């Protein structure tokens, strides 16, 4: 099994030059403030598919912003059973859930080649005291995590597999759109098995629903490539507008 990757300071793109800055950072940060934030950010080599960023039980000392690629977070039961808790795309922060107990309650693993920015939490906390805009941004991120947890509980309460998978696809679509990518044509970095684990469905059920969606011309799917053909109907099946 691969060990968690330790990142080191590395001379790469400044935060202000990153295409994800509008999503990742408060818009009100000036150049001097952004320099101060960039000073504490560590950027290391990309994680390979299957490599761990951190493991459940590891000490909490940093949060991470996904720069490219995708991560899954999951917890292991006492019997070793994996339960996926989320999929994380570029500009999203990972690791904040470890702040309370000072250890990570989940593991984070790369679904594909993935680059992250590591932000040591103590230094981030100190900087947030000096920059109220940054503190508010962190609070927004934590609020979003709470909202995502609530949406997940709502998702798992839906009666049908069709509703769960429609909601999952509409949510991904909104997140890709927010990042400047196509909302209707994208690649799934996660496997059908991982989708099923996340949604509480058997992998056979996931495959059947994807097939049914294609037969009903809601989507076209080939391998991990998905093309949403009827976003209005898919959104209606998901129960309305779903934000990323």
UniProtKB/Swiss-Prot annotation:
SMART domains recorded: cNMP (SM00100), HTH_CRP (SM00419)
Q: Please list the residue ranges annotated as the HTH crp-type domain.
A: 159-232
What Pfam families does the annotation carry?
Answer: cNMP_binding, HTH_Crp_2
Checking InterPro entries in the record gives:
cNMP-bd_dom, cNMP-bd_dom_sf, Env_Response_Regulators, HTH_CRP, RmlC-like_jellyroll, Tscrpt_reg_HTH_Crp-type_CS, WH-like_DNA-bd_sf, WH_DNA-bd_sf
Q: Which GO terms describe its cellular component?
A: cytosol
- Keyword terms: Activator, DNA-binding, Iron, Transcription, Transcription regulation
**Stimuli inducing this protein:** Up-regulated by Fe(3+) levels in oxygen-limiting conditions.
Q: Which CDD domains match?
A: CAP_ED, HTH_CRP
Residues the UniProt record assigns to the DNA-binding region sit at 192-211
Give the residues the record marks as binding a nucleoside 3',5'-cyclic phosphate.
21-149
List the Gene3D superfamilies hit by this protein, alphabetically: Jelly Rolls, Winged helix-like DNA-binding domain superfamily/Winged helix DNA-binding domain
Please verify whether the record's keywords include Iron: yes
* GO molecular-function terms, A-Z: DNA binding; DNA-binding transcription factor activity
Q: Which PANTHER family match?
A: CRP FAMILY TRANSCRIPTIONAL REGULATORY PROTEIN, FUMARATE AND NITRATE REDUCTION REGULATORY PROTEIN
Look up the further comments and give them: Possesses 4 cysteines which may bind a metal ion (possibly iron).
Give the NCBIfam families listed for this entry: PRK11161.1
This protein's name: Transcriptional activator protein Anr
**What organism does the UniProt record list as the source?**
Pseudomonas protegens (strain DSM 19095 / LMG 27888 / CFBP 6595 / CHA0)
Task: Give me the gene this protein comes from.
Answer: anr
């Amino acid at each position: 099994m691969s060990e968690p990757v330790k990142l080191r300071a590395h001379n790469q793109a400044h935060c202000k030059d990153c295409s994800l800055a509008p999503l990742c950072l408060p818009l009100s940060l000036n150049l001097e403030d952004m320099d101060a934030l960039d000073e504490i950010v560590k950027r290391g080599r990309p994680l390979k598919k299957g490599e761990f960023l951190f493991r459940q039980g590891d000490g909490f000392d940093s949060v991470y912003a996904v720069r490219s690629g995708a991560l899954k977070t999951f917890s292991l039961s006492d019997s070793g059973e994996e339960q996926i808790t989320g999929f994380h795309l570029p500009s999203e922060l990972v690791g904040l859930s470890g702040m309370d107990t000072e250890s990570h309650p989940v593991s984070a693993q790369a679904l594909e080649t993935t680059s992250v920015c590591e932000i040591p939490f103590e230094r981030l906390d100190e900087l947030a005291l000096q920059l109220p805009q940054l503190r508010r941004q962190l609070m927004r991120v934590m609020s979003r995590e709470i909202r995502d947890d609530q949406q997940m509980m709502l998702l798992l309460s839906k009666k049908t597999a069709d509703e769960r998978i429609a909601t999952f696809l509409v949510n991904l679509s909104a997140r890709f759109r927010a990042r400047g990518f196509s909302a209707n044509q994208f690649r799934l970095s996660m496997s059908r098995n991982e989708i099923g684990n996340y949604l509480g469905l058997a992998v056979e059920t996931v495959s059947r629903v994807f097939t049914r969606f294609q037969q009903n011309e809601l989507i076209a799917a080939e391998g991990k490539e998905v093309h949403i053909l009827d976003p209005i109907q898919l959104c209606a099946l998901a129960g309305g507008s779903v934000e990323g």
